[in-house]
Every structure is written in C-alpha cells, then in structure tokens.
C-alpha cells in the first residue's frame, strides 16, 4: 500500500484542494493518507504565495524533507508557489520531483505516473481552460463540516495581491455541480457547508436551465438541501456586496451569522493606493446593513499594516475603525512585498521595525476587543455543532457556534456530529466555555 502525506499552507481553499488531491490519488493510485511524512511514498506541499513568510516556510520545509526525497520519496510542490515560481523551485531544491499550480491538480495521476516511470522533473504551471472539477472523483466527507469551492480567481488586482496571477481570473462553477457536491457531502453526514471563493460574493453561475445565479440565490438553493443545517461563505470583497446578499442574512435560517469582509485598512488614502475600489464609509454602510437584518452577525476582517506610504495618521485611522465597528474575528499581517505586484515598486516603503510596532499595537487592540466580545456572550444560549473531543480538557467536547466561536463543554461523545444548545459560562481570549442545556 502506498502512502500520501499532504502539508497545507495558507487559505481554506488550499485546505479544500488538499482534500480533493487525496480523493483523486486515492482513486487513481490507491494512495492512503498518512499524518507521518516518514511513512509516505509521496509528499505534497500545497503552498501559499500571499506573503514572503509563507514562501520562506516552504523552502524551510523542503530542506527538512530533503533526506526523505534522497531515499526515494517523491516530493512535490503544489499550490500558488508552484504556479508563481515554476521551474525556479527545481533550481533551489533540485530534489523536488514535481511542481504544479492550483489549477492543475486534476493532472496529478498522469504526473505521478511520469515520476514513477523515472522522470525527474515533472511540471504543470499553465492555467488550463478545462474545468478541473470535471476531472475529480466524488468528494469524500472529512467530518461534519464540509467545504465546497464555488468560485475561483480574482479580477480586482489589488496592488499587493498575487491571487489574479496564481489562481487566474474570476470563474464560477456551474450551479448543478455545486449542488451535486453539497448533496453528496450531506449524504455522508456533513451538517455545515462552507462555500469557498477568492471573491465568493462575485459568484456568477448558471443552472441547467440557463438561469443566472448570484451568491444570494445560490445560498437560497443550498439551504433547500436536506441535511445541511448551517451555511457559511468566505471570502467576500466589499465591492461585490449587494442588497440581495444582505437580505439572505435576515431570511435564510441556515445561513450562519458570520461575515468575513476584509477591509485591510481604515484609511481612504491607503485603500486607494491598494486599489481596493471602495472607501471606508462604503464598507461601514454594508456592515450596518447586514447588522440591521442580523444583529448578532459576527464580523471578521483582514488587516495589513505597513503598506507603502502608510503614515502614522493612516495607521491610527485603522485603529479608529476597529474601535468604531467592533470585530469578532480578525487576521492581521505586516505588508509583504510580492514580486510582480504594483505595490512592490511603490515609493515610501515602511521599514520592518515600524511594521512590527504597528502590528503589535493592532493585535493588542483586536485581542482586547475579541476578549470583551467573547465575555459578552456569557449567559447566552448558543447552537453548537459538535465537531469532536476538546483539546483543552479531558471529558469535554468542542464545536463551533454560528458566529464561528469555538465552544468547549462537558458532554458524551455520542453528541459528535449533532447540533446542541449550550449556555455560555465563560468567555476566553480565543474560545468560549459552556454547559449543555
């Protein structure tokens, strides 16, 4: 029996891609997944290219895996670094046998066979016109929460971002394919589905009768699938928000009260330099509209500090925005220059020490805010999807609420996979504790 080890870097779409690679190679070459690279015959590193740090992690990991490659394990680099760097990876790590981009993993069976036949450098770095999803086996559930890619790529070309170059232009899967995949997951016990896209609210699909669907209509259709009791979607762009999407937050019971809507900066000047296409007030208006129909919605955002030209006043505007709106979840980063993007050549680059100082201040505010908002949940009753045994305490279970908060509580393992009501008794920095009601 051959074993496959996949290590995933970066976004949730990469996580989805990794599960589909495992499905594909299990069917084509009978690979069985393992969590131990020492036992693997094939190792795939599914990579992220958004930040330089992620790329550095890749080559550090390749160095650690080199002894395994030298004893015959096939080492492959997939994902966005594979797309962006291509043959350069072979130069920096000549023991790597395969390189492929995120739009090419449906070719893995043929690539693996070429490597098994002795080819030492197998590469697929084009962005093909063929729909890769048509060449994948039926999805296999990995638990009670499932992921379904509905949209890929990006047409926004933000000044800092490589996604349009590594994932390609915006493209939406057909409605029928999405529904079929979601139904298959539901039949395997999935109760919550996460609809994925680089710009998921730019979804523009068509059903078998030629009817056009936006994300709001797609959510309404997914909500009709038997067994699917909770729906989320990530990641959205403020430019693609619309009134129909706001309405579903107030009308579709299965839609989780959670909105990941990255703003990146609280300064209009920096948003313009980033080529984001919207202002701070336009962003706030959409947040207010969603909160009007769904008051309990959890707001999540990404923030970048130290973008070229960011002054102390610009940075303070970001802190002010955070204080004004209140964020339940946030992902914050120092600006990382990516080759080929407009921001890489901009003047007034902020030095690393200042970036670090700003990031620390930003995270302190976000952490304080998150703890306050978690403590405010005490005494509330939450519907929690039980995902497994808690890693915090023996005898406890762990799940997530509709607002994507981790909730730990005492209960029997028979509850795993079910929705249960939990009263929150303690708010912690990154989670909640509760008791079964």
From Swiss-Prot:
Keywords: 4Fe-4S, Cytoplasm, Iron, Iron-sulfur, Metal-binding, S-adenosyl-L-methionine, Transferase, tRNA processing. Belongs to the methylthiotransferase family. MiaB subfamily. Monomer. It holds the Pfam family UPF0004. GO terms for cellular component: cytosol. Binds 2 [4Fe-4S] clusters. One cluster is coordinated with 3 cysteines and an exchangeable S-adenosyl-L-methionine. PROSITE patterns: MTTASE_N, MTTASE_RADICAL, RADICAL_SAM, TRAM. The gene is miaB. Catalyzes the methylthiolation of N6-(dimethylallyl)adenosine (i(6)A), leading to the formation of 2-methylthio-N6-(dimethylallyl)adenosine (ms(2)i(6)A) at position 37 in tRNAs that read codons beginning with uridine. NCBIfam families: miaB-methiolase, MiaB/RimO family radical SAM methylthiotransferase. This is tRNA-2-methylthio-N(6)-dimethylallyladenosine synthase. Coiled coil: none annotated. [4Fe-4S] cluster 2 binds at residues 154, 158, 161. Its cofactor is [4Fe-4S] cluster. Its EC number is 2.8.4.3. Residues 2-117 form the MTTase N-terminal domain. The keyword Disulfide bond does not apply. HAMAP family: tRNA_metthiotr_MiaB. It catalyses: N(6)-dimethylallyladenosine(37) in tRNA + (sulfur carrier)-SH + AH2 + 2 S-adenosyl-L-methionine = 2-methylsulfanyl-N(6)-dimethylallyladenosine(37) in tRNA + (sulfur carrier)-H + 5'-deoxyadenosine + L-methionine + A + S-adenosyl-L-homocysteine + 2 H(+). [4Fe-4S] cluster 1 binds at residues 11, 48, 80. Residues 140-372 form the Radical SAM core domain. GO terms for molecular function: 4 iron, 4 sulfur cluster binding; metal ion binding; N6-isopentenyladenosine methylthiotransferase activity. It comes from the Bacteria. SUPFAM superfamilies: Radical SAM enzymes.
